């Protein structure tokens, strides 16, 4: 999975049961990856080298950004999916577990995309290969209001802090 944000290409990979990683790559004005030749890394040819990277939890399927927050979708099999919002971190390429806010979704979430204040969510539960084993079949792209999601989260936190 990958996304483009703030002049950089972010790339991640899916893993089932072990931590995965995301990496950030520089892109020039024409949209090409910026290649580097670093003899200290044993390179005798130019290639794209990540500006930075971070480990993320397993089963990530999609990635996007909203208001300088990193959003990752996580899913595998028939277990509930989740979208996790991470605040920007100076230490770990956005992935600060202490700042994570998680939203639960039906199983088999895949790609996520932000346009303005809207989050678009796509599932694979209606695909032929998975529909017979899926409890909740979502056969369309969902459009969700990110300000409403954040407002809901603030209300939940406010109610919890009262106790």
Feature names for model-found ranges:
Residues 1-51:
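Hydrophobic, aromatic-enriched interface-forming segments
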Residues 6-8, 67-70, 116-118:
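Short coil/turn segments that connect the beta-strands within blades of beta-propeller domains
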Residues 12-15, 73-75, 122-125:
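Recurrent small/Gly-Pro-centered beta-turn motifs in extracellular repeat architectures
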Residues 17-28, 78-88, 127-155:
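Structural motif
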Residues 30-57, 93-106, 156-163:
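Surface-exposed loop and turn segments in beta-propeller and other repeat-based domains
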Residues 43-93:
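Loop/turn-rich, solvent-exposed surfaces of beta-rich toroidal or solenoidal domains
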Residues 89-135:
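C-terminal structured domain segments
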